[in-house]
Amino acid sequence: PKQYAPPPASLREAVQVPFQEFFQRRSIGPALAVLAFMALYKLGDNMATALASPFYLEMQFTPTQIGLVAKHAALWPSIIGGLLGALIIVKIGLNRALWIFGFIQLTTIFGYVWLSNAGPDLVILAVVIAGEYLGVGLGTAAFIAFIAREASRLAVATQLAMFTALAALPR
């Protein structure tokens, strides 16, 4: 791979310079708007994921059922969502994909309302989790593409680390 700049000579150069570079590329208002978007885009999914296990237990699913159904129903839909998301982004563009996938992430969370009304049904649990994680995969593909677009080639590793850490804060 082509190296665009020499490696940083110090920790300050590795962290502070990429941070400053991000704000120097745009004025403070747009830079803060981009950072706010990064912090908020996955907020709903992060909160739903954090509350999922306590919700399943309250719904009277056993830990074994949660482990078997929830974990298996999440893996493949999230992988498929990520791959499908990448293909769709190439086809329709990143900005449209961010909106569409954000809406999908929002609507799939309502599957928990269906599950709550249906009661402890393992099939509905699997369908709800699969739908949510398909949306998670789509949204994550768009989000990663967005932060990659916003990162500078001169400081890509540090900026990607900072941006993903910012998005993970609500967890």
Residue spans for each PLM region:
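Helix-terminus/helix-capping segments at the ends of transmembrane helices and short amphipathic helices
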Residues: 53, 57, 144-152
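Helix-to-loop junctions at the C-terminal end of transmembrane segments
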Residues: 80-99
